């Protein structure tokens, strides 16, 4: 096995003596940094069918707190995966939708979902490996 170090402008990876702030061990690390975590993938999947307001996203992911949803939306917007659109109305209306970059992640998340269905619950419940 070998380790490939890649530099990606605009991304901050490990900091330390051995690696610069924009280096990752591999491109998988970049992807996990962008879409990893407990909530990012769920928010992205929730937005795959179109624009939603904060309250609608919160309703569709009932276990996420408002504070964590706010933080997750900000991180996804900062990464360029979602767009936040503020409408000049009273009361204010804000909608979130996937960017092209965000849409490009959906097939990957769909594949992870299928993998989870195939191996996750089957192994937990029966102790057997799925086909």
From Swiss-Prot:
Q: Pfam families of this UniProt entry?
A: HxlR
Q: Which GO terms describe its molecular function?
A: DNA binding
Would I find Protein biosynthesis among this entry's keywords? no
Positions the record marks as coiled coil are none
Q: Does the keyword section mention Amino-acid biosynthesis?
A: no
Q: Which UniProt keywords apply?
A: DNA-binding, Transcription, Transcription regulation
Which Gene3D superfamilies does the record associate with it? Winged helix-like DNA-binding domain superfamily/Winged helix DNA-binding domain
In what residue span(s) does the HTH hxlR-type domain sit?
Answer: 26-124
Protein's UniProt name: Uncharacterized HTH-type transcriptional regulator MTH_1285
